[in-house]
A protein has these predicted regions:
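Nucleotide phosphate-binding site architecture
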Residues: 12, 77, 152
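N-terminal, active-site-proximal structural segment of metallo-dependent hydrolase catalytic domains
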Residues: 1-50, 54, 65-66, 81
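Active-site-proximal beta-strand elements of phosphoester/diester hydrolases
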Residues: 1-9, 101-113, 146
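Active-site beta-strand/loop signature of hydrolases that rely on acidic residues for catalysis
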Residues: 7, 23-41, 104, 133-155
Length: 155
């Protein structure tokens, strides 16, 4: 399974810059996108489908903010949206896909750059994510975590 993880910083802007042309030439089975800043309805998904991709979107409730998506040529057995952590789930930060014995998690970790409240939220999110991942590790040995980790000491 070949996987690409890519923070697009807005899927609509990426499309304007040739994202679909790039998709036609890449050899990946699975493409995990972070910071999509859009819903599925904001994108011409017929182009994805014509290239053989199944697509799964988890968007933030706040329009134009955050969000993750996975485009895959391999149909997953199961898709789970979110982790059950409400604040995180409202921001569309985690999507999980199961492929036979492999569990893939695409995550957009929060940044703490916009002040103390967001830094506190980030630490809480990291604690919740760690608990979530530890639970998953007990259920499967083949766990792939990809995404934008936004990890820097002061961010």
């Amino acid at each position: 399974m070949r996987i690409i993880s890519y923070n697009v910083n807005g899927i609509r802007a990426a499309i304007k810059k040739g994202f679909f042309d790039w998709l036609k030439t890449n050899p990946a089975d699975v493409i995990c996108l972070q910071e999509t800043k859009a819903t599925q309805g904001d994108v011409d998904v017929k182009q994805l489908e014509a290239l053989g991709y199944h697509h799964y979107w988890y968007s933030a409730q706040k329009k134009g903010y955050s969000g993750v998506a996975v485009f895959t040529k391999i149909k997953p057995d199961n898709v789970q949206y979110g982790t059950g952590h409400k604040l995180s789930d409202d921001e569309g930060r985690v999507i999980q896909l199961d492929f036979k014995d492999v569990r893939l998690i695409n995550a957009y970790f929060p940044s703490g750059t916009s002040g103390d409240l967001r830094q506190t939220f980030k630490y809480e999110w990291l604690d919740e994510m760690n608990k979530y991942l530890n639970k998953l590790r007990k259920k499967t040995t083949k766990l792939i975590l990809c995404g934008d980790y936004n990890i820097a000491h002061t961010e």
